[in-house]
Design a protein with these regions (language model features):
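Bacterial N-terminal signal peptides that target proteins for export
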Residues: 1-7
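C-terminal motif of bacterial Sec signal peptides marking the signal peptidase cleavage site
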Residues: 15-18
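Short coil/linker segments at helix-helix boundaries
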Residues: 22-47, 51-52, 65-181, 190-223, ...
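Charged, well-structured binding/catalytic surfaces in domain cores that contact anionic ligands
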Residues: 186-187
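Gram-negative outer-membrane assembly/targeting C-terminal domains
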Residues: 275-277, 284-322
C-alpha cells in the first residue's frame, strides 16, 4: 500500500499566529532562514511543556509545529534531493518521520487530557471507539484532529511496513471526517486539500468516496480564494500524475506558479515553499510520464510506425551479431 505524504505547508498558518515565529515567519519569502529558527522554538516549547504539561495552547502549537516542520523543512527538501544523494535523502526522511511521530505524541497526549479514552481508541485503531470519542469533540478540536491525522499518515508514508500505524487508517479517517464536520472551512480549505491526497493515495474501499476528489479540489480553491498554490499541486500529484494526464499535470502546476505570493502576504512563506515544489515537479516532468520526450510525445502507434523507424538513429545493416 502506497500513501502519499500530504502537502501540509498549506496548513502552516493554523498555528503561526500563536507561536514564537508569528507574522514575521508567515510573511517571509526565505524558507531557509525560517527553517533554521524552528528547532530552537521547538526546544524552548519542550522545556515549557515540562513545566506546564496542561497548557492546551502550547500543546497544540508544539505538536503542530513538529508536523509542519517535518513536512515543509525536512521531508520536502529531502524529496527534491538528486538520486545520487540517496543516503542523505533517507537520513532526512528518517529524521522527518521522528518529528512527525513526536508531534503526534504531543497532540495525542493533549487530546487524551480533554477526552479520556482517546488514546486507547487511537492506539487500537478501533473505529467504533473512535467514533464514540469524536462525538464529544467540539469545533475548537478541529486543529488537533487535522494535525494528528496528517502527522500519522505522513509518518506511515515513510514506512508503510509500520503495521501499527497502518491499522489506524480507518480510525484516522473518522478523525478527519469529524474535523470537517466541525469546521468545514478550517484554515482556508486545508481539510479539502487534505482530502484530495487522502482519497487519491489510498486503495479503493479502504477510505471514503473517491468520486469526491474533484469537488474537494474545487472547494479548496474556492475557500482559499485561489491564492494558495497547495491545492493545484495536490491535484497535479495525486490525480493527474497517476492518470498519466500530462496536460492536466502541467496546467495545474503552472496555475500554482502563476499565483503572486505578495497578494496574500500572510501566506507568503506557504506559497514560496509550495511554488518551489511546483517548479521541481515541472523541471522533472519526464520522470513521471511514460513516453515523455524533450520535444514531443510519441503516441503508442508511432513506436511501430515504419516511417518513424526509418528515421531512427540505427538501421538493420549496422547491427552485427557474433
Amino acid at each position: 500500500m502506497k500513501v502519499t505524504c500530504f502537502a501540509l505547508a498549506a496548513g502552516i498558518s493554523l498555528f503561526a499566529a500563536s507561536c514564537s515565529l508569528t507574522t514575521m515567519a508567515m510573511r517571509s519569502s526565505n524558507p531557509e532562514f525560517i527553517g533554521k529558527q524552528i528547532p530552537g522554538v521547538l526546544e524552548k516549547n519542550e522545556r515549557k511543556l515540562e513545566k506546564s504539561p496542561d497548557d492546551e495552547a502550547l500543546i497544540l502549537e508544539t505538536g503542530s509545529l513538529y508536523v509542519m516542520y517535518a513536512n515543509a523543512f525536512v521531508q520536502g527538501p529531502a524529496d527534491m534531493l538528486p538520486s545520487y544523494e540517496f543516503d542523505r535523502k533517507e537520513a532526512e526522511k528518517s529524521r522527518a518521520r521522528a518529528d512527525y511521530l513526536r508531534g503526534v505524541e504531543i497532540l495525542n497526549a493533549g487530546l487524551e487530557k480533554k477526552y479520556p479514552g482517546f488514546a486507547e481508541a487511537y492506539n487500537s485503531g478501533d473505529v467504533e471507539n473512535m467514533r464514540a470519542v469524536m462525538e464529544r469533540t467540539v469545533k475548537e478540536d478541529a486543529a488537533y484532529l487535522y494535525w494528528i491525522t496528517a502527522g500519522s499518515l505522513c509518518a506511515y508514508s515513510l514506512n508503510p511496513m509500520d503495521f501499527a500505524l497502518g491499522m489506524k487508517i480507518k480510525a484516522l479517517e473518522v478523525m478527519i471526517d469529524r474535523a470537517y464536520e466541525l469546521d468545514p472551512d478550517f484554515n482556508s480549505g486545508a481539510i479539502d486539500d487534505f482530502y484530495i491526497l487522502f482519497y487519491a493515495s489510498l486503495p479503493e474501499g479502504l477510505v471514503g468516496d473517491k468520486s469526491m476528489i474533484d469537488e474537494h479540489f474545487r472547494l479548496a480553491v474556492e475557500k482559499s480564494g485561489g491564492l494558495l498554490a497547495g491545492p493545484y499541486i495536490s491535484y497535479a500529484q495525486s490525480v493527474a500524475k497517476p492518470n498519466q494526464d500530462y496536460e492536466g499535470f502541467k496546467m495545474n502546476l503552472e496555475k500554482a506558479l502563476a499565483i503572486d505570493p505578495d497578494k496574500d502576504r500572510d501566506n507568503r512563506l506557504v506559497n514560496t515553499i509550495n511554488q518551489r515544489k511546483a517548479r521541481y515537479l515541472l523541471d522533472n516532468i519526464e520522470d513521471y510520464f511514460i513516453g515523455y520526450g524533450d520535444d514531443e510525445w510519441i503516441d503508442d502507434d508511432e513506436w511501430l510506425d515504419d516511417e518513424w523507424l526509418d528515421d531512427a538513429w540505427f538501421d538493420d545493416e549496422e547491427i552485427e551479431f557474433d
